[in-house]
C-alpha cells in the first residue's frame, strides 16, 4: 500500500491516538497544528498532504473540514462532523460534489463487540414476531455515562457522546424510517432521546438513548428486549479493578477502513458512513 503523508490538526487526547495508529500503518505526519504545539511555521493553507486528521475542538470542525474538502484533500475528522444539522449535511454534500473522501471517526461503529451485537440483532429481527399491524415489538436502550472531564466542553453532551449511539442505531435502521419522538436536555451534561422506527421492514422498533458525562458510573452498554428474550451487551472491557479498558480494535478498524478509502476501495460504503455521521448530528443537534 502507498505510503501517505498527513497533517494533524489538534494534538490532544484523540489527536495523539489517531496519530499513533496512523503512524503504525506507515503514515508520516508532515505537519502538526495545535494551540500548544506547531511543528511548522508555514500557514496551514499553504501545506499539502495526502489527507488531514482533524481532532481539534468540535466547534472548529466545520471550518477546517470545509477548507480541506475545497482544496481536494481527504479528511478524517473526529466526531461530531459539525455542530448543526445544516453544516453537517453541507459537508457531506461538498465531499460528494468534490469526490473527496470524508470520514468521521465514530469508533463505536467499528467496535467488534457492537458489530457482533448488530449481526445478532439483524438475525433476530428477521425472525421476530409481528403484531396485527405487522410491527415488531423490540425495545432498545443505549446508555453511555462517564465522570466529569474538561474535554469537549465546547459542545453539549448530545453532540459529544450521543452521536456515538445514534450512529450505531442508524447503521441498523434507515434514517428516513426513524422518527424522533422526544428529546430532553438536562443541562449540558445529561440528555436522552426516544426514537421510533415508523416505517420500513422494522417498523415498531423503539429506542431510548441516555447519555451523561457527569456521572459516578462508567457505562457503555446496549440492551434489547423482545417479547420473549433480552440481550445486554457492554461495549467496554472492564479490568479487575472496575476501570474501563479501551477497546483498541475499534480505533484500529476505523483507521484501516479510512486508508482503504484513500486507496479507492469501499467508496459507496464510505459515502453511506459519512451520511450516517451527518444524520446523527441532525438528531443530536435537535
PLM regions with names:
Residues 71-73, 98-101, 202:
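A short helix->loop->beta-strand "cap" motif at the edges of active sites that frequently abuts
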Residues 185-188, 202-260, 266-270:
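NAD(P)-dinucleotide binding in Rossmann-like oxidoreductases
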Residues 148-217, 275-278, 282:
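Rossmann-like dinucleotide-binding domain that binds NAD(P)(H)
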Residues 82-152:
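A contiguous active-site-proximal alpha/beta segment in oxidoreductase catalytic domains
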Residues 1-38, 259:
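N-terminal Rossmann-like dinucleotide-binding module
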Residues 18, 37-94:
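Beta-loop-alpha module in the N-terminal Rossmann-like domain of NAD(P)-dependent dehydrogenases
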Residues 1-3, 8-9, 38-41, 51-56, ...:
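C-terminal helix-rich "cap/oligomerization" subdomain common to oxidoreductases
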